[in-house]
């Protein structure tokens, strides 16, 4: 009974909009906005206008364990009327800024849907320039089913990208913190410098990379002096 009640609550926005002829309703959400390494991933998703038992545990992806998210992602794709995931690179975030990258990415994710939505729901962000009306819902990834589905797609896809990236850059521990600004991560940047996948426009990355560069420069000076002395 509790599961049925929750499914109905999550569908409230979509059902109300569809009844007013504004469907299909797409949800949009992002993952990685607060990270300092790797891309920001943005997903859009349209779900059928009916309860889906397979998605009964659907909620804000941050509240779900990694195994549950991994299990849910293929189910969301299976049941979705349409879905898309796009990625904005760290280089583009540095070039255009995180806010512009986020909004631009949300527009691109909606445009990439194979079915054109009649209405778009977002998790708190207003998206100008959409071809249809939209509504930002604070905490939407926990209260609107289509946003929760987009949240799972964005976060799980990005987590997989960061796990793969950890193979290329093992010195940063990316598989654990997924590019967020943990102490372990920032200490690694101070030791090794920032990688091409870091967001150099972020103050903490710039500071840690500068500390690495200064320490690296001091070491080179010391080594040069040692060689000259040995000569």
Swiss-Prot record:
Listed GO MF terms: manganese ion binding; RNA binding; RNA-DNA hybrid ribonuclease activity
UniProt-annotated binding residues for a divalent metal cation: 29-30, 123
Domain called RNase H type-2: residue spans: 23-214
Catalytic activity reported: Endonucleolytic cleavage to 5'-phosphomonoester
E.C. code: 3.1.26.4
Domain of life where this protein originates: Bacteria
InterPro entries in the record: RNase_HII, RNase_HII/HIII, RNase_HII/HIII_dom, RNaseH-like_sf, RNaseH_sf
Chief subcellular location: cytoplasm
GO-annotated cellular components: cytoplasm; ribonuclease H2 complex
PROSITE patterns: RNASE_H_2 (PS51975)
One Pfam assignment: RNase_HII
Keywords assigned: Cytoplasm, Endonuclease, Hydrolase, Manganese, Metal-binding, Nuclease
Cofactor annotation: Mn(2+); Mg(2+)
Subcellular localization(s) per the UniProt record: Cytoplasm
An individual GO BP term: DNA replication, removal of RNA primer
Family that this chain belongs to: Belongs to the RNase HII family.
Function: Endonuclease that specifically degrades the RNA of RNA-DNA hybrids.
Protein name, as recorded: Ribonuclease HII
Organism: Corynebacterium efficiens (strain DSM 44549 / YS-314 / AJ 12310 / JCM 11189 / NBRC 100395)
Lineage summary: Bacteria, Bacillati, Actinomycetota, Actinomycetes, Mycobacteriales
